[in-house]
Amino acid sequence: MATHYSANQYQSAFTPKQLHCWSIPKDFKQHPSTHDDYTQFIANERGHLLAGVPRSQKNPWGTFLGTWDLPTKIPPSKLSLTSRSAEASKRLTNWIQNSEELLHACNGLQPQISGKASGKTDPPRDSSQGQQDPPVEESNKQTPLYRGRSKAESNRSSHRSVSSEKGGITAGDKVLQAQS
C-alpha cells in the first residue's frame, strides 16, 4: 500500500484553489425543507393500482418501435425540396406527415425539410399512353447524325478509305452505285 494513503486522496484535485476557481460559492440549505401534506397511496402492497386512481392511456413499455413494428417503407429523415417539382415535394411532405407512428415513436422519425419547391408542375400523364414518346410525323423525321454527317454519308466515307488500285474507283463506290 502507499505510505501516504488517505480516503480523500483524489479530492484535492477538485478543491477551488487547485481548480483556480476564485468565485464565491452559492449558499445551499443544510437540510431539505419539510413536506407539509401527507402522501397519497396509489398502489397496494402488491404494486397494483387502487380503485379510483386514474390510469394512463400510454403504453407502459414506451413508444419504442422494434424492427418488426416499422413500416415497409420509411420516408427520408432529411428532405431537400430544392430541385423538385411542386407535385413531387407535396407528395414527399404528405408522406412524412402521414406516417404518425414514426413521428410519435421515441426512436422514430425527426424530419428535417429544407429548401423550396420549384413553382413548375409536371403535366399529368395518361395511364393509357404510358411513357411512350408522342408520334412523329414523317416530314419531321430526320436521320441521326454521326459526327456531324448522316449515316449514309458516314458509310460512304468509310468505304472510300479502301481503294482499289485500278482506275481510282473504290469498292465502296461500286456498292453504293449498285444500291442506288
From Swiss-Prot:
Any coiled-coil regions, as ranges: none
GO biological process, one term: cilium organization
Statement: the UniProt record of this protein carries the keyword Membrane: yes
Main location: cytoplasm
Alphabetic keyword roster: Cell membrane, Cell projection, Cilium biogenesis/degradation, Cytoplasm, Cytoskeleton, Membrane
Region Disordered, annotated ranges: 111-180
InterPro entries: Fltp
Compartments reported by the entry: Cytoplasm, Cytoskeleton, Cilium basal body; Cell projection, Cilium; Apical cell membrane; Cytoplasm, Cytoskeleton, Cilium axoneme
Domain of life of the native organism: Eukaryota
Gene Ontology annotations for the cellular component aspect, listed alphabetically: apical plasma membrane; axonemal microtubule; ciliary basal body; cilium
Its biological purpose: Microtubule inner protein (MIP) part of the dynein-decorated doublet microtubules (DMTs) in cilia axoneme. Acts as a regulator of cilium basal body docking and positioning in mono- and multiciliated cells. Regulates basal body docking and cilia formation in multiciliated lung cells. Regulates kinocilium positioning and stereocilia bundle morphogenesis in the inner ear.
Record family assignment: Belongs to the Flattop family.
Name the record gives this protein: Protein Flattop
Designated gene of the protein: cfap126
